[in-house]
Amino acid sequence: MGKIIGIDLGTTNSCVAIMEGNQVKVIENSEGTRTTPSIIAYMDDNEVLVGAPAKRQSVTNPKNTLFAVKRLIGRRFEEKEVQKDIGLMPYTIVKADNGDAWVEAHGEKLAPPQVSAEVLRKMKKTAEDYLGEPVTEAVITVPAYFNDSQRQATKDAGRIAGLEVKRIINEPTAAALAFGLDKVEKGDRKIAVYDLGGGTFDVSIIEIADVDGEMQFEVLSTNGDTFLGGEDFDQRIIDYIIGEFKKEQGVDLSKDVLALQRLKEAAEKAKIELSSSQQTEINLPYITADASGPKHLNLKITRAKLEALVEDLVERTIEPCRIAIKDAGVKVSDIDDVILVGGQTRMPKVLEKVKEFFGKDPRRDVNPDEAVAVGAAIQGQVLSGDRKDVLLLDVTPLSLGIETLGGVMTKMISKNTTIPTKHAQVYSTADDNQGAVTIKVFQGEREMAAGNKLLGEFNLEGIPPAPRGVPQIEVTFDIDANGILHVGAKDKATGKENKITIKANSGLSEAEIDQMIKDAEANAAEDHKLRELADSRNQGDALVHSTKKALTEYGDKLDAGEKEAIEASLKSLEELLKDSSADKAAIDAKVEELGKVSQKLGEKMYADMQAQQAGAAGAAGAAEGAAHAGGAQQAADDVVDAEFKEVKKD
């Protein structure tokens, strides 16, 4: 069985890790960095760039460079959070046929799981390059506060990327695993994981206990906001710059997608700089132009100004902390450690707020960018059976229930229930002789069903005629370890049953997922072909260069016929390499041909090198005598074409 890799699929950055024995390894990507920007660019020639290469070209290709797609995964187009993003993103967010939020690149509609799959594929390739073997299984992390649709969509992304997702685990729980297994402190500990990432915020209260030599991680409660993160902090800076520039120059940059992309980059850079310095300068020459000529942007921002701009965002993270503490049934003073996860937690104001709420300094010995991937890799090791000393007890973040008479939300499973879990309840009909019931499944905390997230609905038909309240319909809710819901309804009188895995009216159908997997495989095969062609071209270029060089140096030692054959073959290969439509087989054949005809040339070179080495050895041994004889120069001149004279001492 191959290794199960751990992937932190982040809004802004992603990361992959594996376990080697009991040591964790966070793997560097092909660019040499341990985190990869979650940015995907679709180019004019159908090439797809992922990570740093995509980020580098984003300013010149803003409409087809997709970032922060995790904010849209598993969401409906109508949701207010999605509507808010439509006005802010340089790329187009569109409504899919099923009502989901999709994105557009080069006029083609793309599902968020399909786009996220490109990042996952890069993570998979990163692990494969390191391990030297295929990787097919992964543990992927999601924000703890992700609902069922978002979890299902993340799982779909994994499948499209060619991965069997062994488990979806919550990011704060993964960070707790990374922290807990590393620490030597004995006894039970209660920790708070404060996870402020690029697009989401989570807080989890977790108890780490040592039960008969086994580390038990029990999530007591979780809370959060899936639309609050570093991207929102960046947006505040962008809005401020746009406002200042409009006041100063009278030009509104918010309608200029090229300018917006440059502003986004500058805002992120300024935010990072202000974590370590008190002031930074944003300098963007030629940001736009009007009738009077080009306009330049130059603006100083202080840390105090930034803190004023984002104060309410930082404040918004505190209420979920309060609720999580209350739901866990603990007091703030019971928390032993506070762990910070996510790049945005490096901001001094965030640190200050967390310290103020929890009454203690957060731990600094956890890498906020890598802890989540590390935890996922540990869970992968547990699932593969290689690790037996860890038990993870996670919870469902939101209550689950069905709509009953009067539009009321009747809860079947309450939030913060340990998963996996199962719950059954008997309901009846609302009308006389009702032949079918529709089961509508919701997720959320509101009293009325309409205020919650509709996950899906299904019918149970063929109920025998009976007065209202007589039929007995047993509804079963079953949440698996991924936090994904399976629902069943059974008429106890007839034994008729209907089961579904909640896929909602939204989400991707099996047919769509299969098609996306096929497309991805076709792209991968095409990429492989292009890569092989590039390798052959490079090999051809290198051979042309080395043959030309060898001909210049040793051509006069060849027969005229040999030399002509090499030159003809060389010319033929050069012509072929200039032809952009030349295929791999043709190039390989010409490379082989040139290799054969230039064999004699290679032999001459080899013989000459041997002679030089032997000459050098002889000359070194005889240097002293050569000096006495005054024949050093003569000796050197004689070292030609495998002949040398030994100069003896007088």
From Swiss-Prot:
Where are the residues of the annotated region Disordered? 614-635
Superkingdom, taxonomy of origin: Bacteria
Q: Which UniProt keywords apply?
A: ATP-binding, Chaperone, Nucleotide-binding, Phosphoprotein, Stress response
- Induction profile: By stress conditions e.g. heat shock.
Residues the record lists as Phosphothreonine modifications:
200
Q: Name one Pfam family in it.
A: HSP70
Give a short account of what the protein does. Answer: Acts as a chaperone.
Alphabetized NCBIfam families for the sequence: PRK00290.1, PRK05183.1, prok_dnaK
Q: What name goes with this protein? A: Chaperone protein DnaK
